[in-house]
Amino acid sequence: MQNKIQVKSVEKRENALIFCAENNEIEVKELSARNHVLVDSDNLSFLYILENESSFIYVSIPHTCWEAMHEAMNNDIVMFVRVNDVEMELENLKEEVEYLVENIEGNANYGEELVTAVEKVFL
C-alpha cells in the first residue's frame, strides 16, 4: 500500500481551505488525524501524519501550496485534505506548522533550499 497522499492543488471555500490530492487506493474513511507534521526537506514539503490500525499515511503538502496555507493560517480557516472525493480535517495543522517554522528559521540543518522557501512564505 502506498503510504503518501500527494497534494496537487488547493481549493478555497468561504470558511475552509481544501488540499486536493491525487486519487489513490487509500481508504480515507479508515484514517484518523495524528495531529503531527514532519518536514520533507528533499521535496520542500510538509508531511501531515494520518494513521490507521496498521500504518502511518503522510499527506505531502508541497511548497507550491504554502502561500494558500499561510493565508488560511492567518485567517484561522479550517484546512482539509480531499482524497477520492472524501474530505478530512487536518487537525492542529496551523499550530504544528507554526512550531516548525520557528524551528526552521535560520536553521541550516533543514537545508538551505527549505529554509529559504519557508522564510519567503511564512516570515
UniProtKB/Swiss-Prot annotation:
Entry-linked InterPro entries = UPF0738
Q: Which domain of life is it from?
A: Bacteria
Q: Which family does it belong to?
A: Belongs to the UPF0738 family.
Please identify the protein, giving its name as recorded: UPF0738 protein BCG9842_B4089
Q: Which organism is it from?
A: Bacillus cereus (strain G9842)
